[in-house]
Amino acid sequence: MNFSEGIKYIRKVAYLSQESFAKEIGVSFSTVNRWERGKSKPNYAAMKKINAFCNANLIKVDFDEDDT
């Protein structure tokens, strides 16, 4: 799955709105919205927070190598 699909998948598996997911990982709603629409990608710090969120919630996602 590509990155925007992966972010949406993570959020939906955790049963969170974009706003709630944003709060969980310490970014704005608009940032999560841009990620899910494929308009931008997270920086290294945000990726670490997303990874920590996935690990804490036992969520596994395999991103396409070309999209990361």
Indicate where each model-derived feature is located:
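A detector for short, charged/polar N-terminal pre-domain segments
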Residues: 1-2
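Short alpha-helical DNA-recognition segment
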Residues: 15-33
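Short polybasic/polar patches that bind polyanions
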Residues: 12, 23, 55
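Short basic helix-loop element that most often maps to the first helix and adjoining turn
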Residues: 5-20, 49
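Short acidic DE-rich linear segments
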Residues: 65-68
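DNA major-groove recognition helix of helix-turn-helix/homeodomain DNA-binding modules
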Residues: 44-63
